[in-house]
Amino acid sequence: MSILLNKTRKLNTILQKSGTEPVIFDDICNILSEVLECNVYVVSRKGKILGNNFSSGFECEKLKKEIIPTKKFPDSYNLKLLDCKETKANLKHTEFCTFYENEKCEFENKVSTIVPIIGNRERLGTLVLARFTKKFTDDDLVLAEYSATIVGLEILRSKNDEIEAEARKRAVVQLAIGTLSYSELEAVEHIFNELDGNEGLLVASKIADKVGITRSVIVNALRKFESAGVIESRSLGMKGTHIKILNDRLLEGLKKIK
């Protein structure tokens, strides 16, 4: 059995898992780093480090202490990555630092490979591989481009999940607002005008007097919103009721009906 086939099967274990749960980008980096014996970084289009893994023996303190903790590559470096429209293999590094051009690099014989991550005809990010002395072979590049495809599919899926989650949030808000009577709707508008941000303390009697409605109208409106899962409320006795917004599309939905 070929070495390439064995390595491909290791990557396939991620694909087999992705049918039931999201792929963790660090998992891809860990496996690819193991089979290719190199550093691996999955970078978003905006330069965010979605996942990474260092090969054994890699000791760049600048990268480990200044770049990785921020989970983001410098914009200048990310622009260079985005300039690569196709796979660039075995790029030799100069004597200067990859991320800080005016500083000298303490490592020699470093080679890197840059693989664009593309999905749905859109640039989604970049797969970056780096190691020392040993060049990446054609088999290595096959695995790298295959991995970039896996990552691209997962980024697209996570984007779709985000879109669906946003749509669900907005739909729940509209349903919750739709259950309110005219007086209850008037009450919640005043309630959330009183809040400082996404949570705060409400004294129902004060709002009732201010708006000219009964306290029960306010209580009913809050119960309906709590039943819909868009807010959380907790009675503090004489102090009032603490309200926390759980659905971050609620205020936006209320503004639209004004």
UniProtKB/Swiss-Prot annotation:
Domain of life according to the entry: Bacteria
UniProt cross-references to SUPFAM superfamilies, sorted A to Z: GAF domain-like, Winged helix' DNA-binding domain
Transmembrane segments: none
Cellular compartments annotated: Cytoplasm
GO MF annotation list: DNA binding; DNA-binding transcription factor activity; GTP binding
GO biological process: negative regulation of DNA-templated transcription
Primary localisation category: cytoplasm
Region GAF domain, residue ranges: 1-156
Keywords: Cytoplasm, DNA-binding, Repressor, Transcription, Transcription regulation
This protein's GO CC annotations: cytoplasm
Record keyword Transcription present: yes
DNA-binding region: 204-223
InterPro entries: CodY (IPR014154), GAF-like_dom_sf (IPR029016), GTP_trans_reg_CodY_C (IPR013198), Transc_reg_CodY_N (IPR010312), WH-like_DNA-bd_sf (IPR036388), WH_DNA-bd_sf (IPR036390)
Summary of the function given for this chain in its UniProt record: DNA-binding global transcriptional regulator which is involved in the adaptive response to starvation and acts by directly or indirectly controlling the expression of numerous genes in response to nutrient availability. During rapid exponential growth, CodY is highly active and represses genes whose products allow adaptation to nutrient depletion.
Family: Belongs to the CodY family.
Protein name (Swiss-Prot/TrEMBL): Global transcriptional regulator CodY
